[in-house]
Amino acid sequence: MANHKSSIKRIRQTNARRLRNRYYAKTARNAMKVLRATEDKNEAQALFPKVCSMLDKLAKKNVIHKNKAGNLKSKLAKHVNALA
């Protein structure tokens, strides 16, 4: 266990940040799963900007790497465009 007040606070902050990041990352993963499962093109086109926005926010906050966000958005765009 940490001895200094500042390190105790830092551990507390890190844990809170980790939980927050996990929540937002999981929410985005679930949204991507829903988008990939959609077969209706109109519904997918409505969901796509929301999911892209989530990914951009995660990349901006360094929860995921910006290149990973770009790759995921690209794959999702391919999926949406492939729907009939």
From Swiss-Prot:
Free-text function comment from the UniProt entry: Binds directly to 16S ribosomal RNA.
Gene Ontology annotations of biological process type: translation
Keyword entries, A-Z: Ribonucleoprotein, Ribosomal protein, RNA-binding, rRNA-binding
Domain of life: Bacteria
Any one Gene Ontology molecular-function term assigned to this protein's record: small ribosomal subunit rRNA binding
GO cellular component, one term: cytosol
First and last residue of the signal peptide: none
Full protein name: Small ribosomal subunit protein bS20
Family recorded in the similarity comment: Belongs to the bacterial ribosomal protein bS20 family.
InterPro entries assigned to the protein according to its UniProt record, in alphabetical order: Ribosomal_bS20 (IPR002583), Ribosomal_bS20_sf (IPR036510)
